[in-house]
């Protein structure tokens, strides 16, 4: 066993060579950040500091000089271009290695198959004929052969292995779920064309056990869900639309699973409709969200080839709904997007809670609709075929600021439209069940829903019931275990924010000599405040890295989300540490006189950022900004914003953000009463939009400073170039 190594710079424990010298991880990172920087360090002491584990923070100049003296080479530091080339090379080699492993596995598998009893020449030629006869198969085969130079017999073996026509449902699902890291490649091999995709899904859905195994996998890996949809939609835009359409409703997961179990043939039929007429299929889903009967009419028209006439469309709902098979194709339409529910699967808080609610109320609600539809209209304005979410918001939430048509990804309109739909979906069947119980007990009596009175008149209550949940249903508003785990993860991740900042501030003050007295562009105190934000951002980065969903994303997306969202997270977090009495931010410092940073320092910045910040703080209800759970969830919402520049997997990020929107709503419901919780949710969504607006003012402050006077981390985040 080799003796332990010590860092040649500070004496700390070292693992090996870094940039041509034995150093610890701290000195390696310090050298990588500062060796190529144009920033000029100065020693605050005698120009010959003794660098140890303790003192290495206090003098950057002597530490950097010692790094160079022991032989660390700055030319060994990789540029961004070099890093990108290396990353691509690693991915290429990894892909080649997987192809070779798959080819070897295929050859081994072929030895045990019955078809290997045939003559090898016949088998090889038949497989080659199969590839030459299909354009898609040719493209797939050429890619494999280009990356992995197999012989003719080896090339035919993978083709035989991934031929879905010769595989059982169990083997198909095994290939996808056995190795989640390679599931995407398995889907590409199994579904090379639209027809193959339909054949594979038909075979899987016909086996209930294997279908549920696949559903479970897709809930955990939503990217694979989107890939499968795109295989038979043949259009990335339409596939993404279908993928996201059901994600925001917590009740769809239960419906999808139950319909796969009840009527698998209808699910396959619906997927075929998606393939041939995706526009109509999307229309079906939109209608089915709010009006199952309307969805059935559209579905029947498509299934019959568009032959349904106007009389059939306007006929009484009862004959349609009385047909049990007719009910199932619509819900299987949802069911086909079991993959779609993967968004909620990616959000643990959603499916466990709503499974308990919907299994009890939703299925009977759909099944019993025929008995009430003819004599009692659907008791929700949302169930009207003419229902429009945007119009409903403008009429029922007119106390909110006017909504612009050009709204951002986190705007109140874009989120509220999804939230309101979730509300109707979640309470639709519950309130119908409640109304049926009331009618049986007392006809014509006046009922009260959560404090909102409804008259005996049938039309008037229908306009008011969606506003408040029925008080007759005692819903369990406590967070379930999955939701608590997701919230607990945020709490644990935020522990880094509470570490004392003594050492960070000391190191920061040592570097303040870079602020030139003759530079009158900015006040020195404002520059200190700007550099202090680097300490906060470093801690927010540590927090983000402890969130599982963020950690599982590719490095490109992680960098893009942090560069675009760190200041918004900092703004959101700052409202919690703001002291109204002192008009200052409280920081975790052991010395009380160092633990407060006055907000009036913002007055030295250009523009009216101080006034905007005060407006933001004063309009943020104290009971919300003092609730750490709310602030942490909102930090996660602004972090997972798919509109950031240079983001690659926007759909996955949007999926994760929606899960935190849902967690915020559920948490508010567990703390406040029904109407108060919804009002709080709407107001908090508006605050997220306000954060985006305030962030633009703050970014302008960073862009107007001299890059040589700010921390390297800030230069990297805001792409500041040294003058």
From Swiss-Prot:
GO terms for molecular function: nuclear receptor activity; RNA polymerase II cis-regulatory region sequence-specific DNA binding; RNA polymerase II transcription regulatory region sequence-specific DNA binding; zinc ion binding. Its main location: nucleus. Keywords: DNA-binding, Metal-binding, Nucleus, Receptor, Transcription, Transcription regulation, Zinc, Zinc-finger. SMART domains: HOLI, ZnF_C4. Residues 122-142, 151-163 have a biased composition (Polar residues). Residues 483-723 form the NR LBD domain. A zinc finger (NR C4-type) spans 7-27, 43-67. It comes from the Eukaryota. It is found in: Nucleus. One of its GO terms (biological process) is triglyceride homeostasis. Residues 95-163 are annotated as: Disordered. Disulfide bonds: none annotated. One of its GO terms (cellular component) is nucleus. Induction: By 20-hydroxyecdysone (20HE) 106 hours after egg laying. Residues 4-79 bind DNA. PANTHER family: NUCLEAR HORMONE RECEPTOR, NUCLEAR HORMONE RECEPTOR HR96. Binds selectively to the HSP27 20E response element. This is Nuclear hormone receptor HR96. It comes from Drosophila melanogaster (Fruit fly).
């Amino acid at each position: 066993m080799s003796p332990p190594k010590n860092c040649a710079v500070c004496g700390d424990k070292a693992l090996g060579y870094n940039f041509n010298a034995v150093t610890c991880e701290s000195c390696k990172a310090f050298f990588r950040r500062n060796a190529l920087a144009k920033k000029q360090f100065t020693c605050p002491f005698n120009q010959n500091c003794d660098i140890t584990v303790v003192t290495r923070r206090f003098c950057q100049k002597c530490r950097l000089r010692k790094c160079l003296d022991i032989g660390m080479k700055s030319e060994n530091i990789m540029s961004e271009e070099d890093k990108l080339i290396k990353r691509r090379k690693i991915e290429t080699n990894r892909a080649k290695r997987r192809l070779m492993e798959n080819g070897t596995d295929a050859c081994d598998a072929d030895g045990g198959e019955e078809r290997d009893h045939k003559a090898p020449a016949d088998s090889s030629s038949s497989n080659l004929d199969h590839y030459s006869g299909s354009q898609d198969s040719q493209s797939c085969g050429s890619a494999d052969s280009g990356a992995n130079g197999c012989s003719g017999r080896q090339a035919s073996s993978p083709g035989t292995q991934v031929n879905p026509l010769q595989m059982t449902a169990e083997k198909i699902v095994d290939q996808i779920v056995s190795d989640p890291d390679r599931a995407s490649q398995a889907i590409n091999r199994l579904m090379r064309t639209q027809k193959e995709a339909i054949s594979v899904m038909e075979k899987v859905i016909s086996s209930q056990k294997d279908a549920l195994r696949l559903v479970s996998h897709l809930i955990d890996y939503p990217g694979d869900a989107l890939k499968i949809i795109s295989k038979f939609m043949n259009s990335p835009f339409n596939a993404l639309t279908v993928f996201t359409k059901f994600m925001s409703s917590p009740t769809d997961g239960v419906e999808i699973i139950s319909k796969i179990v009840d009527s698998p043939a209808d699910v396959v039929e619906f997927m075929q409709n998606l393939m041939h007429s995706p526009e109509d299929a999307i229309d079906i889903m939109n209608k089915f969200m709010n009006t199952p009967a309307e969805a059935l009419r559209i579905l029947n028209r498509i299934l019959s080839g568009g032959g349904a006439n106007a009389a059939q469309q306007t006929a009484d709902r009862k004959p349609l709904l009385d047909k049990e098979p007719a009910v199932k194709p619509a819900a299987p339409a949802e069911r086909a997007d079991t993959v779609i529910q993967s968004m909620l699967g990616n959000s643990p808080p959603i499916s466990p809670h709503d499974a308990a609610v919907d299994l009890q109320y939703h299925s009977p609600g759909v099944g019993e609709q025929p008995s009430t539809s003819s004599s009692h209209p659907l008791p929700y304005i949302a169930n009207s075929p003419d229902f429009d979410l945007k119009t409903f918001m403008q009429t029922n939430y007119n106390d909110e600021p006017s909504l612009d048509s050009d709204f951002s990804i986190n705007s109140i309109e874009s989120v509220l439209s999804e939230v309101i739909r979730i509300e109707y979906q979640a309470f639709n069947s519950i309130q119908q069940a409640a109304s049926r119980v009331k009618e049986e007990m007392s006809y014509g009596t006046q009922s009260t829903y959560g404090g909102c009175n409804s008259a005996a008149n049938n039309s008037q209550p229908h306009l008011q019931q969606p506003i408040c949940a029925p008080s007759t249903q005692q819903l369990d508003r406590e967070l379930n275990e999955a939701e608590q785990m997701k919230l607990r993860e945020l709490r644990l991740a935020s522990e880094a924010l509470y570490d004392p900042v003594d050492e960070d501030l000391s190191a920061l003050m040592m570097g303040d000599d870079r602020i030139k007295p003759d530079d009158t562009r900015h006040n020195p105190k404002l520059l200190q405040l700007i550099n202090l934000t680097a300490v906060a951002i470093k801690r927010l980065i540590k927090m983000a890295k402890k969130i599982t969903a963020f950690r599982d994303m590719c490095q490109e997306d992680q960098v893009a989300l942090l560069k675009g969202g760190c200041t918004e997270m900092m703004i959101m977090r700052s409202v919690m540490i703001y002291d109204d009495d002192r008009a200052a931010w409280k920081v975790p410092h052991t010395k009380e006189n160092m633990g407060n940073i006055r907000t009036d320092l913002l007055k030295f910045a250009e523009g009216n950022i101080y006034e905007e910040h005060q407006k933001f703080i004063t309009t943020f209800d104290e009971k919300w900004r003092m609730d750490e759970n709310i602030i942490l969830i909102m930090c996660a919402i602004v972090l997972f914003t798919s509109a950031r520049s240079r983001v690659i997997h926007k759909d996955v990020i949007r999926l994760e953000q929606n899960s935190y929107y849902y967690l915020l709503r559920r948490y508010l419901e567990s703390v406040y009463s029904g109407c108060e919780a919804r009002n709080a949710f709407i107001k908090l969504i508006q605050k997220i939009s306000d954060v985006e607006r305030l962030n633009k003012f703050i970014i302008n402050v960073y862009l107007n400073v001299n890059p040589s006077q700010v921390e390297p981390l800030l230069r990297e985040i805001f792409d500041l170039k040294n003058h």
